[in-house]
């Protein structure tokens, strides 16, 4: 029985991802005719149509979507085989793809990447920034190997390890009435002034939990797409927000015309930071070193 080749599966997923034969061919480093022939051979082998070809765009058939999903899993397992062999020869070398959420990446990566380069000089690190749920999907389908997330968050059947926790701080307009206090309790925060990130950002859920917001207040709250936007809105006097401790010494915050106050230490307004990876990802030495590097960087943000 003839089986699809990995190359054919790569061609198919590339076309579906790029939605364009030319860009897919460039991604696969082949000519467009070679890529088209490879996909045609795959369709002939499976005896189903995977793509609908028009003059303007590429459409995927329903069975094509299902085949592509399985193809990504197969390609991911194939990558894992190569990684496993690489880890046997040199556990701390090779390539690793890391996803990081937007409320961590700008504050932690500048600290942690120099550590990784120093401690793991033969490791090639590829980075992607995205929201938690989309990063989990990418870990599951093998697009990335590890995700750096904030918890609590449902990691489904993936492995995870918490490496640190950090408290939230309150960002206030400088003339706000709460600025006279050295620290604050969550119950002191005026709910009607609280600015939150939009749905899909896990820090939104953490802030809601920390402040024990009722559902009605959650719907009323202004929603922003980035922490930078929230900080600028606070500086303009439009409300207050919570920011993670790792952000308080960043240029974004230090140069903003705002007042920062910690939430009291006995408060539950904290988040945990950790790594998430597939059970089939066996490069334990690399994971251990990554966890150590990120934990060290987290410690530095609390100084």
How would you describe each model-predicted region?
Residues 108, 259-302:
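A late-sequence structural motif
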Residues 193-214, 283-293, 297-301:
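Secondary-structure junction motif
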Residues 93-156, 224:
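Central regulatory/effector-binding core of bacterial HTH transcription factors
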Residues 43-60:
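A short LG(V/I)-centered, amphipathic sequence patch enriched
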Residues 131-144, 149-150, 200-261:
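Hydrophobic hinge/microswitch elements
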Residues 13-34:
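Short helix-boundary/capping micro-motifs
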Residues 45-46, 67-89, 290, 294:
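Alpha-helical linker/hinge and terminal dimerization helices associated
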């Amino acid at each position: 029985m003839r089986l699809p080749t990995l190359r054919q599966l790569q061609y198919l997923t590339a076309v579906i991802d790029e939605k364009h034969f030319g860009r897919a061919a460039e991604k696969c480093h082949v000519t467009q005719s070679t890529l088209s022939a490879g996909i045609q051979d795959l369709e002939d082998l499976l005896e189903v149509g995977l793509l609908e070809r028009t003059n303007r765009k590429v459409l995927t058939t329903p069975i094509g979507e299902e085949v592509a999903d399985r193809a990504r899993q197969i390609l991911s397992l194939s990558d894992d085989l190569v990684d496993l062999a690489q880890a046997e020869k040199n556990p701390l070398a090779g390539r690793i793809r890391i996803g990081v959420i937007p409320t961590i990446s700008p504050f932690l990566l500048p600290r942690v990447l120099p550590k990784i380069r120093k401690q793991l000089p033969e490791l090639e690190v590829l980075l992607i920034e995205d929201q938690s749920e989309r990063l989990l999907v990418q870990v599951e389908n093998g697009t990335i190997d590890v995700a750096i997330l904030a918890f609590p968050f449902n990691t489904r059947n993936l492995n995870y390890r918490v490496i640190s926790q950090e408290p939230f701080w309150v960002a206030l307009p400088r003339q706000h009435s709460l600025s006279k206090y050295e620290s604050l309790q969550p119950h002191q925060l005026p709910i009607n002034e609280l600015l939150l990130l939009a749905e899909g950002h896990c820090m939104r859920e953490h802030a809601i939990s920390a402040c024990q917001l009722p559902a009605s207040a959650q719907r009323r709250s202004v929603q922003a797409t980035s922490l930078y936007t929230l900080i600028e809105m606070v500086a303009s006097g439009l409300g207050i927000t919570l920011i993670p401790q790792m952000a308080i010494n960043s240029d974004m915050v230090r140069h903003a015309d705002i007042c920062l106050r910690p939430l009291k230490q006995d408060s539950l307004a904290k988040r945990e930071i950790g790594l998430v990876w597939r059970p089939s990802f066996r490069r334990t030495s690399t994971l251990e070193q990554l966890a150590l590097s990120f934990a060290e960087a987290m410690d530095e943000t609390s100084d």
